[in-house]
Amino acid sequence: PSDAPNIARVVALKAGIPKEVPAYTVARNCNSGMDAIIEAWRHIQLDEGEVYIAGGVESMSTIPYIVRGARWGLKLRHAQFTDALWEALTDPICGQLMG
């Protein structure tokens, strides 16, 4: 699933890559695929391995709504849904959309 906590590990294991092979996920809003490719290139330049698999799985249109406090129960309180995409793209300093 594209929302797996460590999607790189999930993809590697499902592709038959042995569990002993390292994998890590680059988490960025829009450019994680490009960042993953750059990271692979850096490792190749440093001669830290022979083969790298890099890619991206952004799916910003499927980012969920969140309800703060729901994990521990809201106890007859008003639940407010927050659009996680809108929140992620809003600059916390000036309140304007980034991108």
PLM feature segments, named:
Residues 4-7, 12-99:
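Acyl-thioester C-C bond-transforming condensing/cleaving domain
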Residues 1:
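Extracytoplasmic "Venus flytrap"
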